[in-house]
Amino acid sequence: MKIGVYGASGRIGKLLLEELKGGYKGLELSSVFVRQKCETDFSSFSHAPLVTNDLKAFVRACECVIDFSLPKGVDHLLEALLECPKILVSGTTGLEKETLEKMQKLALKAPLLHAHNMSIGIMMLNQLAFLASLKLKDADIEIIETHHNLKKDAPSGTALSLYETCAKARGYDEKNALTTHREGLRSKESIGIAALRGGDVAGKHTIGFYLEGEYIELSHTATNRSIFAKGALEVALWLKDKAAKKYEINEMFG
């Protein structure tokens, strides 16, 4: 399958290019979208990709777009994909309502998956969190996330997705159950998120289920950002030959 990388100059974008250099599990890097000059030397790649700032040409040259860019960039990408539908794997966070609506329109034409975190471990953590939230009905749930000191958003998109998973399992009102700045006593039907920022931490997420006399903590730690690139490529492989639809990350595990 031919892969197009959108957001190639970013941290994850560069890792995607590195993973695709030798052809990841048969995937071929066919196009790279860049607004300015690309620093990557493609002479060592098994296939020389199209490197362009022409969005339409970029989309035409691939079968699947993997996006790790910025919210405004995703909006432009979706406009091109609505004209020329291709599989989309997007890990960009902070999307506006209008952009998400365009994504839903694309899902009528092509398979796509949008997730805050593409690591296989986080995919499994979401499933475990759902099960624990469902079975441990009397437990108080708290989420702690830690990231590097340059991360812009807080709480992280991954922490919010874990919150949504737990809230859905409990049947909580997702709009009102979230607590990020706690004062006074804890309300029963609430889930707290604490965001820590420091150093160069790639990402750590812990979900605590606190009972009387005992507690359980489920934790995931990213020690290398390459897991996000590899996870996105695994999603691309999984979406191949799928019907047009917006898929959820937990569907990969059945």
Curated annotation (Swiss-Prot):
User: Per the annotation, which location comes first and is thus the protein's main one?
Assistant: cytoplasm
Return the broad EC class.
Answer: oxidoreductase
Q: Name one GO molecular function term.
A: NAD binding
Looking up PANTHER family in the UniProt record yields:
4-HYDROXY-TETRAHYDRODIPICOLINATE REDUCTASE 1, CHLOROPLASTIC-RELATED (PTHR20836:SF0), DIHYDRODIPICOLINATE REDUCTASE (PTHR20836)
Task: Read off the PROSITE patterns from this record.
Answer: DAPB (PS01298)
Q: Which reaction does it catalyse?
A: (S)-2,3,4,5-tetrahydrodipicolinate + NAD(+) + H2O = (2S,4S)-4-hydroxy-2,3,4,5-tetrahydrodipicolinate + NADH + H(+); (S)-2,3,4,5-tetrahydrodipicolinate + NADP(+) + H2O = (2S,4S)-4-hydroxy-2,3,4,5-tetrahydrodipicolinate + NADPH + H(+)
A single GO cellular-component term from the record reads:
cytosol
Instruction: List the protein's name.
Output: 4-hydroxy-tetrahydrodipicolinate reductase
User: What is the species of this protein?
Assistant: Helicobacter pylori (strain G27)
Binding of NADP(+) occurs at 35
